[in-house]
Amino acid sequence: MNGYRTQIFEMDTKPGGCCTSWDRRGYTIDGCLHWLTGSSPGQSFYPIWEELGAVQGRTFVNHEEYARIEGKEGQVLIVYTDINRLERHMLELAPEDKDVIEEFAKAIRAMIDFPIPVEKAPEVFGPIDRLRIMSRFLPYLSIFRKYGKMTIGDFAMRFKDPFLRLAFTRSVNLENGPDFPLLAMLITLAWMDQRTAGYPVGGSLEFARSIEGRYLALGGQVHYRSKVAKVLVENDRAVGVRLADGSEHRSDIVISAADGRTTIFDMLDGKYVNGKVQGYYDRLPVADPVVYVGLGVARSFEDSPRTVTGTDYPLDVPIIVGGRERDRMTVQWYNFDPTLATEGKTVVKAMFTTNYEYWKKLKQDPERYKAEKERIADMVVAALDRRFPGLAAQVEMRDVATPMTFERYTGNWQGTFLGWLISTKTLRMRMSKTLPGLKDFYMAGQWVEPGGSVPTATMSGRNVTQIICKRDKKDFVATKP
C-alpha cells in the first residue's frame, strides 16, 4: 500500500502465530478468538479489518451470553451481552445490591460510544491530533477517574450477596479475574451490547488466512518454516536477518513481531537495552500460560448455553492440573460454529492456567509428559461425563496443548499466548516500538502492546508502518480491497 517491498519469515507452517486453529481427526480446535473487536460497522477497528480483507463476506456470531458462572448451591450468574437484560438478571439474583448493580450497568452504558483512537499512531501525532484526542476523551474523564485504578475484585467487594461477590470476579473467565481491570470489562460488555464484537465463523486460522491472502495479493512474500536466529546489525543499524539454517537475508528495515524477550536478548544479544526495557522483562508480569484440552464429541449439546467464553462451574471431584488442585472448570461448547465439526458433533474446550516451570521440567521426560497429558484429558472427560451422562463414550478426539506446545509453535516466552498480563497498571501503558541505539529496527505485536489481543497486535503493525512512512517523509496510505 505504501510502496515498500516486504517479506515475512515465519517459524511455523501457517500464518497467525497465536491466532490459530488446528485439525485433529475431523475436528478443528480453535485456539484463539472468542470475539473480534470491530466485527461490524460502527466500531473503530472495523475499517482496519476491511483494509486487511478480514471481514468482507465473513459471518459473525453475536452471542446472547458472555459467560455463565454457577455456584455450589445451584445459583447461576448469566453475564448477558444485552446490558438491560444483564441488569434485570442481576437485580433478580441480588435485589439487596440494587444500587451497585445499577451503577455497574450505568458504567457499561457510559462506555458504549467510547472512542478508541486507532486511525493514527500516537508516535506520529501532532499538536492538533492531541487536542482532538483530548476533546474526544473529555466526556469519559469521570469514568476513568472513578474506575481507572479499580479491579473487578475491588468492585465485587461492594456486593452484599456472597454468590454475586464470588461470581463477579470470575465473569471474565480468567483465574486472575479479581485483578482484571474493571474498565476493560466495562468496555468489552459495551461492545457486546452493540454487537460489534462477534465470533468469526471459521475460527482463528481462517481469519488469519484471510489477512495472509490480502498480503500476498498486494505482492508480499511469506517464507514458512523459516525461524529467525539473529537480526543482522552493522554499525548499530539493522540490515537483515539470519535464519536458523544459516542463510542470510538483507533488508533496509527489520520489523520483529516475534517474542519480545527472544528478539531483544537472543536475536540482538541484549546489546540494545536500557533500564526501561530491562525493567519490562524483569518486573512486568506475564499472562499465565495455559493447558488447553480440546475434545471432539459425537454430540450436539443443543441444550447447552452458547456463550462467548464458556460456563464456569464447580466440580464434584477436583482436577489436578500442573500440580495444582482445581475445584472449578470452565467449558466452552463450539456448536455455534458448524465449520469446526460435522453435523451432530461438537468441539468442546476446557482451559486451565498453569505454571511454565512445571511443564518445562516434565517435558524433559517424554513418557511422563505424555502420561500427564493423558491423565488430564481423562479427568476432564470424567468430569464432563458426570455432568453429561454418556459423554465419555461419545468422545472421538482428545488433544492436550501445554505451555511447551505454545512455546514450540510460537517461541513465546514461558509459553504464554497473551504476552504481558493486563492490569490496571499496564492497561494504559505505552511501549516504544524501537530499541535504544539501534536504527532501522522496529517491534510490533503483543510484546509492545500490554494486554495482548489480536486487534491491538494488528494496530501495532499498522502504527509501525505509519512511523516508517513519517520517517521517510511519505503520506501513509491504507486501501480496502
Tell where the protein language model's regions lie, with residue ranges.
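N-terminal glycine-rich phosphate/pyrophosphate-binding loop and immediately adjacent elements
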Residues: 1-113
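A conserved FAD-binding loop/helix module that cradles the flavin
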Residues: 33, 446-469
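Short loop/edge segments at beta-strand edges and connector loops
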Residues: 62, 224-226
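Active-site/ligand-binding neighborhood in enzyme catalytic cores
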Residues: 109-218, 225, 409-424
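A glycine-rich dinucleotide-binding beta-alpha-beta segment and adjacent secondary-structure elements
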Residues: 161-175, 326, 330, 386, ...
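Mid-domain catalytic core of redox enzymes
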Residues: 199, 229-342
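Active-site-proximal substrate-binding core of FAD-dependent oxidoreductases
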Residues: 233, 469-481
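C-terminal segments that line or cap access tunnels to active or ligand-binding sites in enzymes
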Residues: 298-404
